[in-house]
């Protein structure tokens, strides 16, 4: 016998799907005879249409919205842009019929799939000079309110760039990199762009490529109306200058311009630095100063992450307590030692730990 509380599990679960029908709308006259919805096309092939005009009324998606056409809750298709109605098939969606709006009368749909979209920007040429100047100088409200602050920051950046250019010119002469005035005019913007790319997170090779590509495109835009031979001469000079700078100069991890160091030399210097650091045991101020002195030139051949990793490894604020276990006898509290109290959760007692001051980097 089965208990009365047992209930049979249904084999099928019916879920209601809400459709855009008269019954779903909750009308008082639902299920009664009423006027038809006047379904069908409202605009035909090639007819002009305006924004919001209905092109097709339908039950279900007999036709799908194509270019510049939207679809409503009841599957009504309407124009999103003014243009000309097109009924078409799309080879990328076989079995579906589309209705679109072409922006121009002589343009058929579908447009080539892998080409840029055809868009209308809705702009007209302003022939009045005064109105054209006013429109050109017009600013959005947010930018207008921040205009003074933006101009001030822009001027500060320009001053900073000029200071860097003067500094780089001096470094180039100190390192005896042979550049004439014409080459220097390309070298300084190249170095500024190189530094900016490194500051924004580019690696060395990407920063160099981006700097050269940026100056190359800028040069092509400036000289687009001049003779091709002059442009080719300038591009050749830019290539020579960038190659010379890449082989003679570099930036360290503090974004300072220094002499170029090859990857092989950097690996050798890094290995030598690690060997020297392992040989020094920090026990007093002198040994601490020795370790800090080793990091003086490390910025020139180590990346910032490598330098931070080595500093954390060899300049630990507090040495691990495992070194206390190596002592034969525990240390006693004194002026040369530091005593800390710590609660022992296993034994419910307070442990008194005495450590030498040399275990704490800040106490040296």
Curated annotation (Swiss-Prot):
Keyword tags: Mitochondrion, Ribonucleoprotein, Ribosomal protein, Transit peptide
Q: Which Gene3D superfamilies match?
A: 2.40.50.100
What do the Gene Ontology cellular component annotations say? Answer: mitochondrial large ribosomal subunit
Q: Which domain of life is it from?
A: Eukaryota
Q: Where in the cell is it found?
A: Mitochondrion
First-listed, main subcellular location of the protein, grouped into a coarse class: mitochondrion
Transit peptide extent?
1-19
- Name the Gene Ontology molecular function terms of this record: structural constituent of ribosome
Spell out the Pfam families in the cross-references.
Ribosomal_L27, Ribosomal_L27_C
Concerning NCBIfam families, the annotation shows: L27
According to its UniProt entry, the function of this protein is described as: Component of the large subunit of mitochondrial ribosome.
As for family, the record states:
Belongs to the bacterial ribosomal protein bL27 family.
Name assigned to this protein: Large ribosomal subunit protein bL27m
Origin species? Kluyveromyces lactis (strain ATCC 8585 / CBS 2359 / DSM 70799 / NBRC 1267 / NRRL Y-1140 / WM37)
Question: Lineage of the source organism?
Answer: Eukaryota, Fungi, Dikarya, Ascomycota, Saccharomycotina
Q: Gene symbol?
A: MRPL2
